[in-house]
Amino acid sequence: MADQLSEEQISEFKEAFSLFDKDGDGTITTKELGTVMRSLGQNPSQAELEDMINEVDADGNGTIDFPEFLTMMARKMRDTDSEEEIKEAFKVFDKDGNGYISAAELRHVMTNLGEKLTDSEVDEMIREADVDGDGQINYEEFVKMMLSK
């Protein structure tokens, strides 16, 4: 399954994996998964976290290693994001609920994820998604960006 991913996707997923793998030991634990999900405004129970890990934990050791993470991401991409998941993700970024993601909101979420971005990196991310050029990302632009990934 993971062999259907491009080099670029694999390197993006490596970056995402390292955001989750807080202690850098090459595995994601329920604790690390919980930390990232809470920083995204979710509040999973211990049982939910264990279920999420067990879903992709091929070798049954209670953690997710990078190959298991790739399999999970490949599966998720195949099931392409449902409208509902995209709406939820948009809400995570759109802190003030005004229907737009500003540079400040984007920076805030990325910082919570442990990604320290420069202003120019944030501006670049906004520019890439900002079809109408108003300096923010609206829902339609967000959907387009999510589906083009």
UniProtKB/Swiss-Prot annotation:
Keyword Metal-binding: yes
Pfam families listed in its UniProt record: EF-hand_7
Record-listed Ca(2+) 3 binding positions: D94, D96, N98, Y100, E105
One of the record's GO cellular component terms: myosin II complex
InterPro entries found in the cross-reference section: CALM/Myosin/TropC-like (IPR050230), EF-hand-dom_pair (IPR011992), EF_Hand_1_Ca_BS (IPR018247), EF_hand_dom (IPR002048)
Residues annotated as binding Ca(2+) 2: D57, D59, N61, T63, E68
Binding site for Ca(2+) 4: D130, D132, D134, Q136, E141
Highest rank taxon of the organism: Eukaryota
Keywords for this protein: Acetylation, Calcium, Isopeptide bond, Metal-binding, Repeat, Ubl conjugation
Coiled coil: none
Binding site for Ca(2+) 1: D21, D23, D25, T27, E32
GO molecular function: calcium ion binding
Site description Not N6-methylated, residues in chain: K116
UniProt record similarity statement: Belongs to the calmodulin family.
More details: This protein has four functional calcium-binding sites.
Name of this protein: Calmodulin
Organism: Agaricus bisporus (White button mushroom)
